[in-house]
């Protein structure tokens, strides 16, 4: 087992969670517990795409999405449990699980669009979320594309969650170079840059068991991006070299 930190990894069975687990392993860290959230697979549905890789010089770990999440979790987690037929983050069993084990930190890697309920955030345990976007300037779910169009790079921000979307205190943030043409943006690049910042944050937490400094978000600087027109999305992809 790698060097352990008292953390619960609250993980959807997703490409993002795979990237997080793999970078934790690569960084020589581990977590005390993982709670894996597995949705019931609908009949006739396919597995998520593994994403296209490409040669790059980004100097970050690219996830191998062909590796099952459970395989990496077994390597990084002292103990893990699974919720089968997962129906949503408001499941009372999740709150009970967190209350029982009382980790010092929760890494939240839920399914897209999920908001951690106030009851869970009120447990007095910090929930760490890695947002793809340089906060407060880029809020929402399509920030990778708008950031590429506007600035030619992409930002990532580590925040401690509050009930409001993307509105928590900033632990740290960083801008990353644009990916090369041909690299899958949604499943590879986006998750890789999030995971890279997560590694940095967990290394700090492992040393101090706390975050010593925060940046408060300035609402006057914020912009929210949810929907992107297919033409704009295509232009963002074409901008890559």
Model-assigned labels for residue ranges:
Residues 1-241:
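One-carbon transfer enzymes
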